[in-house]
């Protein structure tokens, strides 16, 4: 699943390429990709003729403001890529990808395509005078953004203190820190020297501080490299992310640790894989 760096990469690409573009027409190829409104006719009626404004990221969600030609607010377009979703800015004449679910035609031979192999991704068209949180209910449950001032040592300590769950599982909880996923949780735990099985309640103040800083640094580095592509992720122009080749531990089971040379190990925690160095994270 695309995580914060991948979604942020897409967000920046959308701001660069779609801002000010008019959605002249649209085509829904898979109606169940529409979370709201579920009616294809209603979705098309709401989206035709509006203009893309600014895109923002909230956790792993993308929110694009929509405006009318008069400048009046026209709502929001929300997207969650889930496991395999892609938003691609392409020439309209380009052959259609087999898993294309939605096409937004923007004139000048350009279109924004939503491509999704496993069909878990969702699209929302939020009407004006309605907040995105009202329609996209998952937004209400999100924790703080890791780049915000709210992500402080005090906040993190409050969320981890007394918790009986292991830290890897806690980092994947979107109600604690929004946007973290399997890849960057492993990377941050390695960088902070914390073993993934450590219970939240057993983390010392210094470890919590180091982990918080590591989360921010790892995410910043991944964004600089355009995210990670291990299977399906691509930026809006179809370019793969480059973080994977420099990962500390994720996807490197059996390979030598880049710091100490010990073989990277993997274990299952809560149904998810955790990659770690048994020496650096002892």
From Swiss-Prot:
Catalyzed reactions: Hydrolysis of DNA containing ring-opened 7-methylguanine residues, releasing 2,6-diamino-4-hydroxy-5-(N-methyl)formamidopyrimidine; 2'-deoxyribonucleotide-(2'-deoxyribose 5'-phosphate)-2'-deoxyribonucleotide-DNA = a 3'-end 2'-deoxyribonucleotide-(2,3-dehydro-2,3-deoxyribose 5'-phosphate)-DNA + a 5'-end 5'-phospho-2'-deoxyribonucleoside-DNA + H(+)
Cofactor binding mode and count: Binds 1 zinc ion per subunit.
Statement: the UniProt record of this protein carries the keyword Lyase: yes
Zinc fingers classed as FPG-type: ranges: 248-282
Top-level taxon of origin: Bacteria
SUPFAM superfamilies cross-referenced by the UniProt entry: Glucocorticoid receptor-like (DNA-binding domain), N-terminal domain of MutM-like DNA repair proteins, S13-like H2TH domain
Cofactor: Zn(2+)
Binding site for DNA: 99, 118, 163
Gene Ontology BP term (one): base-excision repair
GO molecular function: 8-oxo-7,8-dihydroguanine DNA N-glycosylase activity; class I DNA-(apurinic or apyrimidinic site) endonuclease activity; damaged DNA binding; zinc ion binding
Keywords, alphabetical: DNA damage, DNA repair, DNA-binding, Glycosidase, Hydrolase, Lyase, Metal-binding, Multifunctional enzyme, Zinc, Zinc-finger
Signal sequence, start to end: none
Membrane spanning residue stretches: none
Recorded family membership: Belongs to the FPG family.
PANTHER family: FORMAMIDOPYRIMIDINE-DNA GLYCOSYLASE
Role summary: Involved in base excision repair of DNA damaged by oxidation or by mutagenic agents. Acts as a DNA glycosylase that recognizes and removes damaged bases. Has a preference for oxidized purines, such as 7,8-dihydro-8-oxoguanine (8-oxoG). Has AP (apurinic/apyrimidinic) lyase activity and introduces nicks in the DNA strand. Cleaves the DNA backbone by beta-delta elimination to generate a single-strand break at the site of the removed base with both 3'- and 5'-phosphates.
Subunit structure: Monomer.
Protein name: Formamidopyrimidine-DNA glycosylase
Gene name tied to this protein: mutM
């Amino acid at each position: 699943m695309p995580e914060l760096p991948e979604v942020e990469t897409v967000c920046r690409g959308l701001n660069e390429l779609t801002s000010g573009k008019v959605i002249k027409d649209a085509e829904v190829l898979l109606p169940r990709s529409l979370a709201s409104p579920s009616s294809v006719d209603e979705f098309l009626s709401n989206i035709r003729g509006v203009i893309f404004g600014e895109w923002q990221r909230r956790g792993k969600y993308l929110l694009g403001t929509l405006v009318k030609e008069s400048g009046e607010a026209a709502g929001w377009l929300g997207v969650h890529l889930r496991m395999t979703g892609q938003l691609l800015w392409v020439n309209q004449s380009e052959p259609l990808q087999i898993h294309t679910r939605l096409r937004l035609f923007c004139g000048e031979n350009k279109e924004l395509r939503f491509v999704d192999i496993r069909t878990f991704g969702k699209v929302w068209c939020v009407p004006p005078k309605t907040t995105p949180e009202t329609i996209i209910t998952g937004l209400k449950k999100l924790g703080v953004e890791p780049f915000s001032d709210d992500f402080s040592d005090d906040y993190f300590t409050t969320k981890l203190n007394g918790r009986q769950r292991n830290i890897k599982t806690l980092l994947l909880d979107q109600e604690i820190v929004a946007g973290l996923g399997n890849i960057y949780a492993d990377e941050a735990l390695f960088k902070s020297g914390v073993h993934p099985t450590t219970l939240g309640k057993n983390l010392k103040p210094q470890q919590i501080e180091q982990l918080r800083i590591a989360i921010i640094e790892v995410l910043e580095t991944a964004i600089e490299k355009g995210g990670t592509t291990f299977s399906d992720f691509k930026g809006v122009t179809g370019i793969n992310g480059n973080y994977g080749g420099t990962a500390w531990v994720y996807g490197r089971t059996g390979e030598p640790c880049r710091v100490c040379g010990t073989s990277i190990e993997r274990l299952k925690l809560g149904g998810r894989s955790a990659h770690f160095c048994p020496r650096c994270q002892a």
